[in-house]
Amino acid sequence: MIFGHGIDLQEISAVKKAYDRNPRFAKKVLTPKEWERFESLSGERQMSFLAGRWAGKEAFSKAWGTGIGAVGFKDIEILNNDKGAPVVTQSPFEGNVFISISHSGDFVQASVILEKNKR
């Protein structure tokens, strides 16, 4: 049974401006494992990754029904599976979490569906 669906759109250049103003911004959004991946990237790919994780976490919080605040950025971890697809590996939701992150030009869109387990 679907519990919630959330979508978010981020502008990569806006995320870059936030990062340029305060590089600690990335550490506020990313978990240690996500930070490791972020550090392994460079330039535009770094900002694209950060914007994608931000969008994914915002989309999760919307699907959860609270928005960011009741659930924090570090409460949600998005890593990649062995095929490179994003996977939510940590969240406060007890059930299935489906995520898709798409990049196009200066934009990143994320969609999250939360599915309750049947009992």
Curated annotation (Swiss-Prot):
Residues holding Mg(2+): 8, 58
Reaction catalyzed: apo-[ACP] + CoA = holo-[ACP] + adenosine 3',5'-bisphosphate + H(+)
Pfam families xref list: ACPS
Obligatory cofactor(s): Mg(2+)
Residues of the signal peptide: none
Keyword Metal-binding assigned: yes
GO biological process assignments: fatty acid biosynthetic process
EC number: 2.7.8.7
Superkingdom assignment: Bacteria
GO molecular function annotations of the record: holo-[acyl-carrier-protein] synthase activity; magnesium ion binding
Family, as annotated: Belongs to the P-Pant transferase superfamily. AcpS family.
Biological function: Transfers the 4'-phosphopantetheine moiety from coenzyme A to a Ser of acyl-carrier-protein.
Protein name stated in the entry: Holo-[acyl-carrier-protein] synthase
Lineage of the species this protein comes from: Bacteria, Bacillati, Bacillota, Bacilli, Lactobacillales
